[in-house]
Amino acid sequence: MFFLPGVLKNGAVSGIIILRIRSESDDIMVKKVYKHLDKLPKGSASDKLTNGCLVLEGGGWKGLYTVGVLDCLMMNDINFTSVVGCSAGALSAIGYVSGQIGWGARIDLTYRHDPNYCGIGAIKRDGGVTGFTYLFKKIIKDLPLDKKRLCDPSRRLAVSATNLVTGKAEYFEKGKCNLTKAIQASATVPYVSKPVMIKGVPYLDGGCAEKIPFPWSEQSGEKKVMVVRTRELSFRRKPGMPGLAKIMYRKYPNLLESMGKANENFNEMVQMLEEKSENGEIFLIAPSKPVKVKRFDGDMDKLAALYWLGYNDMKERLPQLRAYLEK
C-alpha cells in the first residue's frame, strides 16, 4: 500500500488516501532488472521517412506492446512522419521519433522496480507514481536520445492530455509547447498523481477523456494512418467510472462528465477503428493474444513477453503494412 498525503490538493481531496499501485508479485524493497536485456535490439533507425501518422494508445505497462511494435518498425525502415500518443503511448513515442531502437524497452525493463522511476521516490519528487524528473534528468543521461532527430521539424510529434477545467482532450505538438511538460501531463495517472499545471491550467492523463488519440490524425488530414492498440481487438470497457472520481474531482464537473462517458466513447471508437481497418482506410494492429499485464504489473518476464509479442506481431504483419502504405 502507498499513503499519499494531500495527493490532489489542487481541486481535490487533501488528507490521506490509501491505494495499492503495485501487483502482488512486487517487492518494493528490491530492485529487479530483466535478466535478458542483452537480447533486446539496439541501434539507430535509418533517416528514411514514411508518409503517414502513427496513433498510439495508452495503457500503463501494457505500453510495452507498443514499444515492441515501434522497435520492429524502426528495424524495418518504417519511420512515420507524424506520431500522436496518449499516456504510455506518449512516452513510447519519444524513442521512436528520436530513432532509438530498444530505448523504451531498456528503460522499462531496467528501471521498473527503481522507486525513483516508479514508486515512493517518484511520489516524493513529482507527486505521482511515475518519476518524470528522474526520467528526464537521470535516465536519459544513461540512455541518451538523438535530440537533433527528435527536434527535426519534418518529424511531427503530438501528445494528448486531459484539461480538468473543460474535461476535453487537448493536443500538444513538438515545437509549439514544452514537450517534457506535455508528456508528463499526458502520462500523469489519475487518482494517484497530482495534476500537471501548464500555463495555469491543470491536466491529467490523456486517457481520462480520450483513450486513443485518433482524432488528431483526422484533424491533421493524414492519408495513411496506423493505430497501435494495447489490448486485444475483442476488448471492451464497462460503462461508468470509479466512484472515487466523484470525490477527488468534484470541483471539475466537466471532467466528471467526460470521465463518465469515456468508456462508452472508447467502445464506439474501437468499433469505428475496426470498421475503418476492414475497409482499408487505416492499418490497425493489436495484441494477437489476450493481455494479462496489469496497469502497475511488476512481473518482469510478463512485461518482456508483452514487448516481444508486439515485436513479433508487427514482424508478421509487415507485408500487410507495406501493402497498405503503397496503395
Please report, for each region that a protein language model flagged, where it lies by residue.
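Aromatic (phenylalanine/tyrosine) cluster motif
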Residues: 2-3
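Short, positively charged and aromatic/hydrophobic N-terminal segments
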Residues: 9-12, 16-20, 27
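Patatin-like phospholipase
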Residues: 24-86, 94-327
